[in-house]
Amino acid sequence: MKELDAKVVELLNNEPLWWIGTSGADVNVVPVGFKAVTEDGKLAVGAVFLNHTLENVATNGKVTIAAGGSKGMTAYQIKGTGKYITEGPIVDKFKAMADEMFKGQVTAKGALIVTPEKVLVATPGPKNNAEL
């Protein structure tokens, strides 16, 4: 597992959306707002509308998450392996968030937990695509 440094974690925590990309029978990229960096440095995404994403993760487990740009040019891309879970404290957290936002009409089915393996700079400039 690649440890995320403080500046990456800060950006991930402050961005309103992450973009999650997967590949399988079809490539898929979607914005996600139900997200968190876990205490152990993994990335968690609430599975509210992630049907194609979860199909692709079941195929090969490969996930890319990109975040940044809402408050400047700084951005990162995190590549890793995803695992879908349907119970536990993080799932309960996302269910509560979805219930509050959607007034019980939609809920989180589970959570996609991404173990980071590589972090790349996605900021324009000479360090673009450099691995941290």
Could you say what each language-model-derived stretch is?
Residues M1-L132:
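Binding-site signature for planar aromatic cofactors or substrates
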